[in-house]
């Protein structure tokens, strides 16, 4: 859950469908205050538990710097991959069978391909 419209709407719909979702938040420590307030408001309003993973800033900053130096267009690939992994980690930890994601639909499907190896390669070549 990011606190933006897409993930907030997904929580609302999941509750409407009679599901008992767990909101999972990947905190890269760059949250806008409105996002933090929205997460609290949505989870409280719909009675949804929240599980948050906070990044190790030293590692995350090293990776982000490498992406800046690489000049690649997938600047947030590291965050996207980390978010997917955090959702899978939460699902395993709490024995959750299904993962629901809300997306804005802004990025065209198939416009990017990246995986953990891509992030690791950029980090190895360009990080401190």
Predicted feature locations:
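ATP-dependent adenylation/nucleotidyltransferase module used to activate substrates
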Residues: 1-128
């Amino acid at each position: 859950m990011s606190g933006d419209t897409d993930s907030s709407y997904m929580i609302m719909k999941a509750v409407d469908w009679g599901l008992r979702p767990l909101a999972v938040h990947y905190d890269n420590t760059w949250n806008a205050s409105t996002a933090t307030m929205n997460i609290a408001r949505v989870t409280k309003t719909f009675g949804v538990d929240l599980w948050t993973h906070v990044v190790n800033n030293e590692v995350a900053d090293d990776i982000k710097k490498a992406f800046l130096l690489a000049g690649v267009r997938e600047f947030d690939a590291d965050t996207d991959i980390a978010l997917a992994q955090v959702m899978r980690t939460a699902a395993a930890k709490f024995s959750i069978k299904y993962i629901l994601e809300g997306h804005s639909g802004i990025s065209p499907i198939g416009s990017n391909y990246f995986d953990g190896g891509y992030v690791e390669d950029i980090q190895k070549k360009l990080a401190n």
